[in-house]
Design a protein with these regions (language model features):
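N-terminal structured subdomain of primase-like DNA metabolism proteins
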Residues: 1-113
Length: 113
């Protein structure tokens, strides 16, 4: 099944883009919380403070999954899994726009290295 102009391989690649690459591409300010201690150290979770377009966020990233800690625990779409969901949460973009942002960020990162 095709989603927009991309094939499944491209969409899978878009989902895997790391959050620092996306945040840099979007021009967001972010910093890791050096005092964060995850409940389960083996899961390698990180807390990240993000400022984007005048809004503040506090995310917990565990692998591809994320949770916005500043939203109430029972809020719908408080978190998600993968870079596409993350871009949609942060920017309010739709799926097609979010995939494009992820792929553009991936291309920019490849060009920079």
């Amino acid at each position: 099944m095709a989603y927009g102009p991309w094939n499944q391989e491209q969409i899978d690649a878009a989902r895997e883009v790391a959050f620092p690459i996306l945040l840099g591409h979007l021009g967001a300010y972010y910093k890791l919380d050096p005092h964060f201690q995850p409940l389960d150290v083996s899961r390698c979770s990180q807390r990240v403070q993000v400022a984007y377009q005048g809004r503040d966020f506090r995310f917990i990233f565990t692998g591809r999954k994320f949770v916005n800690e500043l939203l109430p625990a029972d809020a719908l779409q408080r978190g998600g899994g993968g870079a596409i969901d993350f871009v949609r949460h942060l920017t309010g973009y739709n799926f097609v726009q979010a995939v494009k942002v992820c792929l553009d960020a991936l291309a920019d990162a490849a060009d920079a290295s």
